[in-house]
Amino acid sequence: MSTAKTLTLEMHLGDLMIGELSFDATADTFAVHYTKDWQQSGFPLSPTIPLDGTGTSNQISMFLVNLLPENKGLDYLIESLGVSKGNTFALIRAIGLDTAGAIAFVPKGALLPETQLRPIKAEEVIQRIEDPTMWPMEIWDGKPRLSVAGVQPKLNLFYNGKEFAFAEGTLSSTHIVKFEKYHHLVINEFITMRLAKVLGMNVANVDIVHFGRYKALCVERFDRRNIPGEQRVLRRHIVDSCQALGFSVSKKYERNFGTGRDVKDIREGVSFNRLFSLAAKCRNPVAAKQDMLQWALFNLLTGNADAHGKNYSFFMTPSGMEPTPWYDLVSVDMYEDFEQQLAMAIDDEFDPNSIYAYQLAAFMDGLGLPRNLLISNLTRIARRIPQAIAEVILMLPPLDEDEASFVAHYKTQLLARCERYLGFVDEVRDVEV
């Protein structure tokens, strides 16, 4: 029972209670206790919170903080609840029914809300796009509606192929609708995601939807599956790389204090070495490393310097982790005012324009992987991209003149990057490091 000193949330997977999350308000510490049945047959919240209950308060706190929205979404949540930013327990209690992954955090003895859908109208979305100060995208019906991590304006919604709605009860969000924060960002992410799909990568399904004249990106959640006719949505548990490593969201970049002269050499965040170390916890370590390598190379070729630790995730299963489909793929190279330093260094190089055969060879040597694996993957992907990007452009909805110019520039930059890497990739085999 929760008291003023000890507060408790039940952890539910569907109809099954798998354990409890408790918070000692006096000591300011968390604890997770799994049920005996779940310890026998289930999976942990994350690798750092094992089934034997030995996860530390700090590890549990880091896991929970990574579930929270960022920037304005978090600010609105804090304002609505009247709690401090550091009150992680209160924040999780507020959004715990529909966070990333499969686990719902439910107050003890609480009844689930009635199963229902609250449809959203295009006019309501347009109002929030055009006047976000008066009508924040994150606030609906007087309460925060954003419960997924990230900084981009977005809504997590139930979608049945016809209309979008907020879901309650046994239903939950099945899609994430992302709105433009930067020039042509929706088109950019659509192209990059579909390009990965055409190349045969395991990537989330995306489409462009319209609210009046405004475009938005509709992303199908791979941790959710709607069961038509049964009034329920199945969930699958996932963790991002920060959670899997026991890192806070502040360490999603390898240079966790930024790129300033006095702090750029502090590299305590998610790096490729740390990411690849997680393959040992996967059901198929070899396949996991192959997926990680392809993700790294695809991001180099598409100019996605912002591929950080929260942009690579894993399914949690009783037999180990498994990489999820890719997501949040954007060519940030298209925006001059974006940070163009890599989120994770290739060897010790953060400047993508300074990566050559030497850096790629040292990168593979440092990971303990054969250089030929990089050569074959990079060559195959780069050679297939010209045809693949042509196919993807045909998938776009009608574009205006400015959008068409953006797409043409995207293609030119993409093909130039492919030619650049193809020009020296064979040197990776024999270069001395």
UniProtKB/Swiss-Prot annotation:
PANTHER family: SERINE/THREONINE-PROTEIN KINASE TOXIN HIPA (PTHR37419), SERINE_THREONINE-PROTEIN KINASE TOXIN HIPA (PTHR37419:SF1). Pfam families: Couple_hipA, HipA_C. The modification Phosphoserine is found at S147. GO terms for molecular function: ATP binding; DNA binding; protein serine kinase activity; protein serine/threonine kinase activity. ATP binds at V151, Q152, P153, K154, K178, E220, R221, F222, H308, G309, K310, N311, Y327, D328. Its EC number is 2.7.11.1. Toxic component of a type II toxin-antitoxin (TA) system; overexpression in wild-type temporarily inhibits cell growth, overexpression in a hipAB deletion leads to acute growth inhibition. The toxic effect of HipA is neutralized by its cognate antitoxin HipB. In the ternary phosphoserine-HipA-HipB-DNA complex the DNA is bent about 125 degrees; all HipA in the crystallized ternary complex is phosphorylated. In E.coli phosphorylation of HipA is thought to release HipB from the HipA-HipB-DNA complex, suggesting the complex functions differently in the 2 bacteria. Belongs to the HipA Ser/Thr kinase family. Induction: Expressed in late-exponential phase; part of the hipBA operon. Keywords: ATP-binding, DNA-binding, Kinase, Nucleotide-binding, Phosphoprotein, Repressor, Serine/threonine-protein kinase, Toxin-antitoxin system, Transferase. This is Serine/threonine-protein kinase toxin HipA. The lineage of its organism: Bacteria, Pseudomonadati, Pseudomonadota, Gammaproteobacteria, Alteromonadales. Disruption phenotype: 50% decrease in biofilm. The gene is hipA. Monomer. Forms a HipA(2)HipB(2)-DNA complex with cognate antitoxin HipB; has higher affinity for the latter when HipB is prebound to DNA and HipA is phosphorylated. Binds DNA in the ternary complex.
